[in-house]
């Protein structure tokens, strides 16, 4: 698939990583972040890369367990991603995810 820089790329960890390391920042109110068709300077980026999101309630009777699982998913759980062709999330996304997870309460 042709990316914004005009190069043809294929789906894979290298192209996804190139898209994920682009300089795009998450929306501070929603944490939404798009890495689809990143700027030209990311010439190795696969143009239709995206993040996988989890929608969870901010208030839950199971908040402690939910937070524990989500923290694991965005930290140690990232080690399982490459075997499933998922690129680990970049540090900038991890910081936002941890702040958001911390808001979950009973």
What are these regions (language model features)?
Residues 1-76, 84-106:
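Flexible, solvent-exposed loop/hinge segments that line or gate ligand/substrate-binding clefts
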């Amino acid at each position: 698939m042709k990316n914004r820089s005009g190069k043809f790329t294929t789906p894979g960890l290298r192209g996804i990583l190139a898209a994920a390391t682009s300089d795009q920042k998450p929306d501070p109110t929603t944490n939404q972040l798009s890495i689809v068709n990143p700027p030209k300077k990311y010439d190795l980026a696969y143009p239709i890369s995206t993040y996988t999101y989890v929608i969870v309630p901010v208030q839950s009777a199971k908040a402690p367990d939910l937070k524990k699982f989500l923290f694991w998913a965005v930290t140690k759980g990232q080690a399982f991603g490459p075997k499933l062709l998922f690129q680990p999330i970049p540090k900038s996304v991890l910081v936002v995810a941890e702040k958001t997870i911390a808001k979950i309460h009973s």
